[in-house]
Amino acid sequence: MTDNRVENSSGRAARKLRLALMGPAFIAAIGYIDPGNFATNIQAGASFGYQLLWVVVWANLMAMLIQILSAKLGIATGKNLAEQIRDHYPRPVVWFYWVQAEIIAMATDLAEFIGAAIGFKLILGVSLLQGAVLTGIATFLILMLQRRGQKPLEKVIGGLLLFVAAAYIVELFFSQPDMAQLGKGMVIPALPNPEAVFLAAGVLGATIMPHVIYLHSSLTQHLHGGTRQQRYSATKWDVAIAMTIAGFVNLAMMATAAAAFHFSGHTGIADLDQAYLTLEPLLSHAAATVFGLSLVAAGLSSTVVGTLAGQVVMQGFVRFHIPLWVRRTITMLPSFIVILMGLDPTRILVMSQVLLSFGIALALVPLLIFTSNATLMGELVNTRRVKQVGWIIVVLVVALNIWLLVGTVMGLS
């Protein structure tokens, strides 16, 4: 009887700890459903139907492993990835890493900020510039929560993640995808032509986010409660739940685009405005509105996450700190320049995702090296199987990027 009571008590304590440590992965997961994903997934679904769904499935599984490794590094060492690189690599390498990480963070933020601005434009009927102003104001308000600590921000961003997931459940209901074809697309790999390879690289870039690899290790480095092993166990649950939601959203985006556009002959849908305007007559005004609202929610939350990641990168690599509002102001400028110059915002979104895919290996290689170091990690060091899978992911990413670069140079994409 006493043993049962102790067992129940320890079980409740474990669940309580798991709940208390839930949150960091939800902030990281928001980076996986940003407006760049909308643009890339819609274009892929409209152009190739369900044929590229397998890329989303595998990219999401890779992302799960990567985020677990990132979170584990913070738990085991009390330092984030940028700080570990600063401590272990020569100064020129550290400065190179800092510059490329800042460029990638800004490219990410460009996609996220413009995506939210497009969402405001679509649902409110304002200009893109006015939508950008609204986005700026909204992100400043959300960032103010950071003054109250990490938990309030986790709750708001987690809520926005769940809102986007709910929105895509509604979109699936409206679009009625062919479940047999959807299932086939998820499990049977296909790259029918060079354009599909280009979009597959974009999907990979949109799904595995370099800036959140840096951020997640920072979000877990100050976690308290339980042993390191217990914190790691709770974090695996956190990552599994958050990334499953993000993976569902990405699959639903592409499946909705395939069902609504590809199979109705609208295979040329390549921008978010066009997607919104085409959804209304094809499905309903409600479907188009839900799409616009989900775009705003994803854009606002992910641009906040991008700002936080940029701060982590700067502090970690070069020990330099600027107020969040200053960083937010600076990183908004490229978005306003793109809008004022009249550049195609959706093309900018897709190109930014391709750029991101080049930063994945640069973040992954040191992450794998550090998490495989028994001196640093102790009992949380990577197993041989994890090391093998990790290096396979690096090789795949690099190979896909070389293919993408060659294809782009030759004018195939």
UniProtKB/Swiss-Prot annotation:
Membrane topology: Multi-pass membrane protein
NCBIfam families: nramp (TIGR01197), Nramp_1 (NF037982), PRK00701.1 (NF001923)
Record GO biological process: iron ion transmembrane transport; manganese ion transport
GO annotations of cellular component type: plasma membrane
TM ranges: 20-39, 52-71, 96-118, 126-145, 156-175, 197-220, 239-258, 277-297, 328-344, 351-370, 388-406
Localization, UniProt: Cell inner membrane
Family the UniProt entry places it in: Belongs to the NRAMP family.
GO molecular function, one term: symporter activity
Keyword Membrane: yes
Stated name of the protein: Divalent metal cation transporter MntH
A Pfam family annotated for this UniProt entry: Nramp
Ranges of the Periplasmic topological domain: 40-51, 119-125, 176-196, 259-276, 345-350, 407-413
Ranges in the topological domain labelled Cytoplasmic: 1-19, 72-95, 146-155, 221-238, 298-327, 371-387
Organism: Salmonella typhimurium (strain LT2 / SGSC1412 / ATCC 700720)
Keyword rRNA processing: no
Coiled-coil stretches noted in the UniProt entry, renumbered to this chain: none
Described function: H(+)-stimulated, divalent metal cation uptake system. Involved in manganese and iron uptake.
Alphabetic keyword roster: Cell inner membrane, Cell membrane, Ion transport, Iron, Manganese, Membrane, Symport, Transmembrane, Transmembrane helix, Transport
